[in-house]
């Protein structure tokens, strides 16, 4: 008894366009954005971050305006809890480079977010095609906006003894990867639902 080996018809493979397969495969950048949204603790993130940094280097001389917006921290190489993504906290960075202003902001998600936020205000200065100088000015609690009382604040001056900066390594309409002066890597996604004017004067 002979065993017959079924062979696929050549036309089954001839009809497949290799370029179509390449174009439909998700890029490293798309995979990174998807993971940052859905699973920011995925162990593949550092490798994807490095790949995207090498393929999509930022150029602030060309794309500085893309920095403007409210950015949400989704991943960080830091071990400090306030520099890492936490499911029950909004960890935001608000940037307006045209006005030379920015702030880091922590607030509870959900109804508790109406109690206010912890903020650190900063002056921003572009230095070169990837580096932004950061001078922290004041930090503390900023309460909710009240019609009769305005917006209560408990802020104090920040004593910054050493220069600080951010190296923006990847920047587009959705994604920002940057490295702080201490070497910490941050990956952030833009929040189009939040307005810069609601956080900066």
Question: Would you name each region that the model predicts?
Answer:
Residues 4-6:
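Intrinsically disordered, low-complexity polar regions and short flexible loop motifs
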Residues 17-201:
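Soluble ligand-binding/transfer domains with enclosed cavities or grooves
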């Amino acid at each position: 008894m002979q065993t017959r080996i079924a062979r696929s018809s050549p036309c089954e493979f001839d009809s497949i366009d290799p370029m179509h397969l390449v174009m439909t495969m998700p890029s490293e950048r798309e995979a990174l954005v998807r993971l940052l949204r859905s699973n920011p603790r995925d162990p593949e993130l550092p490798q994807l971050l490095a790949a995207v940094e090498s393929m999509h280097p930022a150029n602030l001389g060309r794309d500085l305006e893309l920095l403007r917006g409210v950015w949400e921290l989704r991943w960080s190489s830091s071990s400090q809890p306030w520099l890492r993504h936490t499911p029950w906290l909004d960890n935001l960075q608000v940037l307006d480079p045209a006005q030379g202003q920015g702030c880091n902001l922590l607030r509870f998600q959900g109804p508790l977010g109406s109690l206010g936020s912890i903020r650190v205000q900063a002056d921003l200065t572009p230095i070169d095609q990837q580096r932004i100088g950061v001078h922290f000015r004041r930090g503390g609690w900023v309460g909710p906006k009240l019609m009769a009382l305005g917006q209560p604040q408990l802020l104090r001056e920040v004593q910054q003894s050493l220069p600080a900066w951010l190296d923006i390594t990847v920047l587009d309409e959705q994604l920002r990867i940057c490295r702080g002066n201490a070497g910490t890597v941050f990956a952030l996604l833009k929040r189009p639902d939040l307005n810069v004017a609601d956080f900066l004067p």
